[in-house]
Each structure stands twice: as structure tokens, then as C-alpha cells.
Amino acid sequence: MSTVEDSKDAAAGEITDDFDRIQDTEWSLSEVWNRYGSWAVTVLNLTIFFCLWELFAWSGAINPLFLPAASSMFSALWEGLTTTAPPGAVISGSIRDHLFYSLTNLSIGLGIACVIGIPAGLLMGGNKYVERILSPYVWALASLPRIALVPLFILFLGFTVKMQITIITLSAVFPIIINAWAGVKTTEKSLLAAARVFGASRSELYFKVVLPYTLPFIIAGIQQGIGRGLIGVIIAEIFGGSKGLGYLITRAGDTFNSSLMYAVLFLLVVVSLSLIQLTRWLEAYIAPWRRIESL
């Protein structure tokens, strides 16, 4: 009798173990999908897009001068990143050199924009007198197209790196100011009231309540500043540069090298998305509670 009961217990234990293994497998698959699913969908989406592009280009529906094959674009990109044209060539240097030049100017301009924009936005949000003084200038300059200022900057600064960095800074600074400003202004009153109940001083209110609440707004402003800054890079290099990705686009257009032009445009998209993803990782590091709230 005991032997039969032992057999039943062993069978039940095996069934339980099998069920636990199935649950573990399902959890592991769910965890893998949550972690890598979005990347897999993105890769699949891009693969389909470039395959359709390649087929459409090879069909001859559009002149290759206007729409080269995706393979031609990637070939031009690889060649530009791995080789260097001789100094006497129509397009001297390599994509790598022009990319480094543009990224250097973007980094400097974006850094200056953060140094100016974050304190200015926080100050405008925290002081109504500063807000009244600066807000008309901020809105006026933020709504002004940067391209309209290029002739003025060329007149004052010439065709120099200073002119390009100035345009990049002005393109990136206003989204940062406006977002930091909005972050301070929209801080929940209940949080401030609770902190005051616990005896928080004015400085503690600012650094322990207002600033952490504003961090996501600042990160969003920097993300917008990256996009605007890249636009500033291209504008500055097209109209007043002799080097950089904007200059390279112009020279590729002048020589009807559409493969190179599309390669540079594709590279700009990759750079922009990479920098924005970098800011997301930065936000996850300096504001980990945001990741908890999104779960």
C-alpha cells in the first residue's frame, strides 16, 4: 500500500516539476521578448524597408540619379568611412573626417547650449521677475528661423568655426530653456506642500523636490536640442562651411553623386537616433525612479 502511495507522490512531484519548468520557460520567453522584442521589430522593419527600396530602385520606375539602390547607398557609405579621397579630388577627405568635424562642432554647441539653457530655464521657472524679463526674448528668438540669421552671423563672424558653433548653439538652446522652464512651473504643489510640512528649507525644496521633478523635462529638452542642433550643423555647413556633413551633401549634389548624398543623410539619421538613445540611458542612470514609474 505504501508503495502505491509513494508512486503517486513521485508522479505528482514530477508533474509539479514539469509545470514549474513550463512556467520558468514561459517567464524566460516573456522576459526575453520584453527586453529584445522592440529591437527585433525595428530590425525586421528596417530590413523590409531596405529590401523594398532595393526592389523599387531596380525596377527602373525612378531614375537612379534621384533614387539610387539601397545597396549603392551602403556601398558609398562603407567606401566613405573606410577610405580617404586624395586632396586633389572633387570631394576631398572621407565621410569619417567630415563626420568627426560635424560631431565635434555639435558637441561644443550642444554643451554651450546646456550650460546656458538649463540654468536660464530653471531661473525663469523659479523667479517670476526673471520670467517676465526673459520670456519675450526667449519666445521671439525661439520662433525665428535659424536660417534667417546665417547671413548676419557670416557678416559678423565670417566663414569660421565660431559662426557654425554659434548657429548650433542658438538652434539647440531654446528647447532646453523652454523645457527646463516648464518643468519647474509644473512641479506638483502637493509635493512642495508635503516637503514644507516635514520642515524642508527653500534650498532643500529646490534640490530635493523641484530639481528631481524637472530632470525628465531637461532630458526631453536636450533630446529636442540634439535634433535642432543637427539641423543647425547642416545649415551652417551648407551655407558657410568647407568641411562637415552639410558641406559633403552640397558637394555630392553638385557632382550628381546621389549615392553619397543618401549615404550622408542616412548617417545623419543614425547619429541623431544614437544620440537620443544615449540621453535615454543617461535619464535611466540619473533618474531611475522614472523607469519604475513606467513599469
Please provide the spans of the model-predicted regions.
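C-terminal transmembrane helix and the adjacent membrane-cytosol boundary/short C-terminal tail
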Residues: 185, 220, 262-295
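Transmembrane-helix boundary motif in ABC transporter permease subunits
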Residues: 108-138
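Transmembrane alpha-helical segments of polytopic membrane transport and secretion proteins
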Residues: 1-47, 277-295
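Short cytoplasmic-facing helical segments at TM-TM junctions of multi-pass membrane proteins
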Residues: 176-222
